[in-house]
């Protein structure tokens, strides 16, 4: 519902990485027992949801969904711009999708499928899949190292180091298109 104060880490706890590219956060799931252990760990630490990162193994995802159901906790997806995976997560019972599916336009069949579930979408348009992220807009149009509000939190040299000088033409910015698509979903009750 958007009423959680503070960083997401306090609502989802440690993410569940089932791929080995984050070796220190790797949490393999080969059974419902494994999934129950990981979900219970997060719940014991106060999480109200678990976040499944880029889990390409559908059986493992289904174990996480079942464990989440059994333990009364939400399960949120980080899908790395894989619309097909998003659709299987939707069908399998995920309760949340962060970012977007990286897909636009979204046609009526997918809108109806989304609308028939209890899935919530947090678009996070600063990170947009399959196009330049929303962050690039600010790096291109603003001199962030001169922003007085940002300078309250960061030193000027840090802001200069973080800038990413790139150029995108206005019609290259995918964030606005994705925002329009997300608004259509919102208007339809998704």
Indicate residue ranges for each PLM-predicted region.
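Active-site environment of divalent metal-dependent phosphoester hydrolases
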Residues: 1, 17-18, 55-60, 80-87, ...
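N-terminal small/glycine-rich loop or linker at the start of catalytic domains
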Residues: 7-24, 62, 152-163
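Generic structural signal for hydrophobic
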Residues: 42, 64, 68, 88-90, ...
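Alpha-helix-loop-beta-strand connector modules within alpha/beta enzyme cores
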Residues: 2-15, 61-80, 118-123
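Active-site neighborhoods of metal-dependent hydrolases
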Residues: 38-56, 102-190
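Active-site mouth loops of central-metabolism enzymes
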Residues: 19-36, 76, 81, 168-171
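Glycine-enriched alpha-helix->loop->beta-strand junction motifs that scaffold or abut catalytic
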Residues: 46, 69-73, 90-97, 116-120, ...
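Alpha-helical scaffold segments that flank or form the walls of functional sites
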Residues: 1-5, 27-48
């Amino acid at each position: 519902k958007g009423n959680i104060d503070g960083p997401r880490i306090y609502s989802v706890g440690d993410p569940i990485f089932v791929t080995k590219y984050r070796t220190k956060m790797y949490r393999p799931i080969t059974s419902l027992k494994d999934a129950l252990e990981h979900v219970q760990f997060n719940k014991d630490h106060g999480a109200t949801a678990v976040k499944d990162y880029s889990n390409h193994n559908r059986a493992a995802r289904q174990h996480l969904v079942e464990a989440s159901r059994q333990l009364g906790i939400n399960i949120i997806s980080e899908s790395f711009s894989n619309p097909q995976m998003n659709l299987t997560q939707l069908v399998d019972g995920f309760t949340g999708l962060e970012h977007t599916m990286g897909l636009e336009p979204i046609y009526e069949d997918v809108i109806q499928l989304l609308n028939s579930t209890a899935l919530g979408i947090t678009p996070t348009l600063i990170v947009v899949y399959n196009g330049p992220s929303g962050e690039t807009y600010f790096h291109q149009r603003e001199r962030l190292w001169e922003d007085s509000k940002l300078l309250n939190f960061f030193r000027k040299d840090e802001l200069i180091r973080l800038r990413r000088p790139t150029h995108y033409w206005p019609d290259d910015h995918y964030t606005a298109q994705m925002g329009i698509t997300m608004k259509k979903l919102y208007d339809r009750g998704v």
